[in-house]
Structures are given as structure tokens and as C-alpha cells.
């Protein structure tokens, strides 16, 4: 590590490895699900010698989503040239409030989702290196933080192949990933009931990020196909957790 003013720089070792193979993903999906379970299991209960003032993850996500959706409301329109309508943005705003409340109430009511988990924060194929069907390296750990593990698992189930392919995982591929994860780090009944809400939250986090890049960062050509594909598949993608 090297510090310069208020900036801290980290030099990471180069790791040889292969990218995610979208043509034959089954074994890599299985390996990735198992590795995420191992990561959560190994870091469960970890106590850092430094205690940053972390806000609850759901609080950060709620603020992030409300800010993005408010920005989007000012630029989206109802013509076919826009990927989403103002009405859809309004519906998502209402859904954010309901989803966050559901997560918070379940945590308070059940007391079975300890914050002793440490999550990766952006566990996707783009942040993994493979050696055939094995995981060679997990990258970009700068997003790691204490939080309920469902935030990691839900985001991975929805956005694991993002950037490498325009379309999300199928429900069958999600099942492969989840089964492999639970073979190492099983979910509790409380967590199973909350998984659908976390899938929806994950979808909203990703789709609003892409829409933000689409409208405000000059990335329409890049993000447009992703947005269209995920909107077409939204029911299958976020409905998986309830099956």
C-alpha cells in the first residue's frame, strides 16, 4: 500500500487465469457458487482490528437507489426512444421502499441474520479468474464489507455474467449456482424467505446503475443492450428466489 494525501494505492499481484466461458458455463458456475460459499464461511465472524463506521447495507442501498431514481425521473420519457418510462421509475421508487422495509422488519423480527458476515460486494464473473472449471483468483476485494450475505448472493444470482454477455443467467443456471453455494454454506429458513426480496433489490441496483450510465455517462451503445435484455427477462431473473 502507498498513501498520497487522502488517496491510498494498492499494488496487486498479477494472477494468470482465464475469463468466464459463456459457451460452456455450467462447471464454472458451480465452482463460482461453491467459492462464494467458502468465502462467506471462512470470513464469517471475522473481526477487523479497524472498525470503520459502516452504515447498514440496506440503508446505503436505499439512499443509492432513491438518488438514482430521482435523477432518472428528470430525463426519462414515455416515447419508444427511452428504455424505461416515467411510470416505471415511479413504480420502482415505491418498490424500493417496500423491499427495504421488508428486509429491515425481517431482521428485527427474527434476529437470525447477524451482521458478522463479510461480503465481497461485487461477486461476478468479471471479478474472477478461472483455470478450466476451477477458480484461480477472486479480484476487486475493495468492495468487501460487513453485511448480510444475501446482498452478495442475490447480486451474484442476478448479475453474475454481466459484461461478458447481454443476458442474465437462466433459472436453471441460477439453480446450479445456488445449489453449489449451499453445498458449502447453507441458507437458513429465514434467509430463504428473504432471498426473493434480495433478488429484486439486486436487480434494481444493477439496472439503475446501467440507466445512470446510459443517460449521464455517454454509454448508451454499451449499456443499451444490457438494459433491454434484463428488462425482458426481469420476471424470470427476480422470480427465481421464490421457486
Predicted feature locations:
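Active-site activation/catalytic loop segments of kinase-like enzymes and analogous catalytic loops
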Residues: 150-185, 201-218
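All-alpha amphipathic helical-bundle segments outside canonical DNA-binding/catalytic cores
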Residues: 187-199
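Active-site acidic catalytic loop and adjacent metal/ATP-binding pocket
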Residues: 101-151
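Short small-residue beta-strand/loop micro-motif enriched in glycine and branched aliphatics
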Residues: 18-22, 137-138, 163
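ATP/Mg2+ or Mg2+-diphosphate-binding catalytic cores
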Residues: 71, 76-78, 206-243
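Conserved structural core of kinase catalytic domains
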Residues: 1-29
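A cross-family kinase active-site recognition segment
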Residues: 22-91, 116, 228
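Mechanochemical coupling/switch segment within NTP-driven translocation systems
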Residues: 86-106
Amino acid at each position: 500500500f502507498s498513501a498520497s494525501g487522502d488517496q491510498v494505492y494498492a499494488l496487486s499481484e498479477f494472477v494468470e487465469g482465464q475469463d468466464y466461458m459463456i459457451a460452456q458455463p455450467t462447471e464454472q458456475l458451480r465452482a463460482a457458487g461453491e467459492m462464494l460459499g467458502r468465502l462467506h464461511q471462512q470470513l464469517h465472524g471475522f473481526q477487523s482490528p479497524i472498525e470503520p463506521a459502516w452504515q447498514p447495507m440496506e440503508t446505503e442501498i436505499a439512499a443509492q437507489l432513491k438518488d438514482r431514481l430521482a435523477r432518472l425521473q428528470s430525463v426519462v420519457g414515455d416515447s419508444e426512444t427511452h428504455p424505461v418510462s416515467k411510470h416505471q421509475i415511479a413504480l420502482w421508487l415505491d418498490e424500493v421502499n417496500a423491499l427495504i422495509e421488508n428486509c429491515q422488519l425481517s431482521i428485527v423480527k427474527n434476529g437470525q441474520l447477524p451482521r458478522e458476515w463479510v461480503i465481497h460486494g461485487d461477486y461476478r464473473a468479471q471479478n474472477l479468474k478461472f483455470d478450466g472449471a476451477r477458480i484461480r483468483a477472486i479480484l476487486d476485494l475493495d468492495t468487501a464489507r460487513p453485511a448480510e450475505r444475501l446482498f452478495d448472493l442475490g447480486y451474484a444470482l442476478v448479475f453474475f455474467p454481466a459484461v461478458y454477455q447481454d443476458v442474465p443467467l437462466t433459472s436453471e443456471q441460477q439453480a446450479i449456482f445456488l445449489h453449489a453455494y449451499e453445498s458449502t454454506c447453507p441458507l437458513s429458513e429465514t434467509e430463504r424467505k428473504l432471498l426473493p426480496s434480495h433478488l429484486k433489490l439486486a436487480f434494481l441496483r444493477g439496472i439503475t446503475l446501467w440507466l445512470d450510465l446510459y443517460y449521464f455517462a455517454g454509454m448508451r451503445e454499451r449499456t443499451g443492450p444490457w438494459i433491454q435484455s434484463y428488462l425482458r427477462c426481469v420476471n424470470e431473473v427476480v422470480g427465481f428466489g421464490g421457486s
